[in-house]
């Protein structure tokens, strides 16, 4: 595909983002985020120096069409005439209970982290050893087990504290809860949890008008520097010391994360293969069935590396849906996700605190589409979040009857 055509499609998506923002008079609408993200990724791929493969025209057209399906579904979700007038929401007794569970469980979680790190005593760094232990896929693979449920509990406790706060940001217990959640995220070692927590907090604050968009932009720039480069160097993923090439190495790694997924997906999309018919999309429930003793095939969560020409094993959000059901499946699921995001956002704007929290959480898989699928691959995690959040609030209609 020519550079001019690639830029045209990318700029079309940027224009679509502006159009949705003007139509809905809302720059935070999920349709704006979706079209803007893929438009900017396309522009970056076209104009920044890199050694990745050229993107095929069919891949760019597929991304453009799927994004349009997402946007259309998001802007037609629900009605702006819906109202919550006369309805109030109150936090339940689960709100403080989650806080105390997270607080009291943290020492046990930290003890388990130390125990896991000792099984991979390859370096002098606790975090590197812990990361190795948690990411091995051989017979020596280890996990937090049931203690892993403490992480979503800590996250929900923090997000509910923010949503319910009468202060500008967190109240006192909320700040403590935030520190606890960050501790859990650090002990989980993956950037996934740090980014998930930050993105959810940021968009909850935006929806509730606790911060201004420009404040978020500046804060995000600082957070990316700390979250990506700082944590990456902590677990030895980017950089090699603090010499003169460290910054360049980190920037190269950042470019690899940002653009290599698109190149890898294009390579897979251009290679004919038999469809998997749900093995990727339904991996989470299949894994649960396997854990319950059923003899079923579970595809590995970590994908094989391909060379584009740099080695990478990230393939954008689109891989499982195309692998399972080709382009019709991708269009269907993108429309489904767009509908979900649009509905959550509308209800969040109308004041439903449950949807405020859930929308904040849902922005994470939306903004990580350039990287990999975080929708159905984390299905069990989203179910846990949804149940906990819903139980943290009680809806009281005008009549006074609880619902």
What are the residue ranges of the model-derived segments?
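Alpha-helical transmembrane spans of integral membrane proteins, capturing the lipid-embedded, hydrophobic core
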Residues: 39, 105, 178, 197, ...
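Small-residue-enriched transmembrane helix-hairpin modules in multi-pass membrane proteins
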Residues: 129-144, 228-342
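Membrane-anchoring hydrophobic segments
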Residues: 1-175, 213-214, 336, 341-349, ...
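Short helix-coil transition sites and intra-membrane helix breaks within transmembrane domains
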Residues: 191, 310-311, 401-402
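Active-site beta-strand/loop microenvironment that shapes enzyme catalytic pockets
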Residues: 180-188, 193-194, 200-202, 318-346
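Interfacial segments of alpha-helical transmembrane regions
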Residues: 94-98, 218-222, 273
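Hydrophobic alpha-helical segments of polytopic membrane proteins
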Residues: 61-64, 167-249
């Amino acid at each position: 595909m020519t550079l001019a055509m690639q830029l045209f499609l990318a700029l079309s998506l940027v224009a679509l983002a502006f159009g949705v923002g003007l139509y809905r008079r809302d720059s935070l609408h999920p349709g704006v985020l979706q079209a803007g993200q893929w438009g900017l990724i396309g522009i970056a791929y076209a104009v920044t120096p890199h050694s990745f493969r050229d993107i095929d025209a069919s891949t760019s057209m597929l991304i453009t069409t799927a994004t349009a399906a997402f946007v259309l579904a998001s802007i037609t979700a629900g009605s702006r005439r819906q109202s919550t007038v006369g309805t109030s929401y109150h936090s339940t007794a689960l709100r403080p209970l989650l806080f105390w569970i997270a607080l009291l469980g943290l020492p046990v979680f930290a003890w388990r982290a130390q125990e896991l790190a000792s099984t991979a005593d390859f370096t002098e760094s606790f975090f590197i050893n812990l990361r190795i232990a948690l990411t091995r896929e051989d017979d020596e693979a280890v996990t937090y087990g049931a203690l892993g449920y403490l992480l979503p509990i800590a996250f929900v406790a923090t997000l509910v504290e923010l949503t319910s706060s009468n202060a500008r940001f967190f109240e006192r217990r909320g700040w403590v809860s935030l520190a606890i959640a960050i501790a859990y995220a650090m002990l989980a070692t993956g950037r996934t949890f740090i980014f998930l927590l930050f993105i959810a907090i940021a968009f909850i604050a935006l929806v509730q008008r606790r911060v201004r968009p420009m404040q978020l932009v500046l804060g995000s720039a600082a957070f990316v520097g700390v979250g990506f480069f700082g944590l990456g160097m902590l677990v030895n993923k980017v950089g090699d010391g603090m010499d003169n090439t460290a910054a360049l190495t980190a920037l190269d790694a950042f470019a690899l994360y940002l653009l290599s997924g698109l190149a890898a997906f294009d390579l897979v999309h251009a290679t004919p293969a038999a469809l998997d018919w749900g093995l990727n999309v339904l991996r989470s429930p299949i894994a649960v069935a396997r854990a319950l003793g059923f003899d079923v095939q579970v595809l590995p969560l970590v994908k094989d590396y391909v060379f584009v020409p740099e080695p990478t094993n990230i393939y954008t959000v689109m891989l499982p849906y195309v692998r399972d059901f080709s382009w019709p499946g991708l269009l269907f699921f993108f429309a489904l996700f767009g509908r979900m995001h649009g509905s959550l956002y509308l209800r969040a704007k109308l004041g439903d605190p449950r949807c405020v929290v859930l929308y904040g959480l849902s922005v994470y898989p939306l903004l990580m589409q350039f990287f990999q699928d975080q929708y159905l691959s984390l299905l069990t995690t989203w179910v846990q979040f949804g149940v906990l959040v819903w139980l943290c609030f009680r809806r009281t209609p005008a009549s006074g009857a609880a619902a």
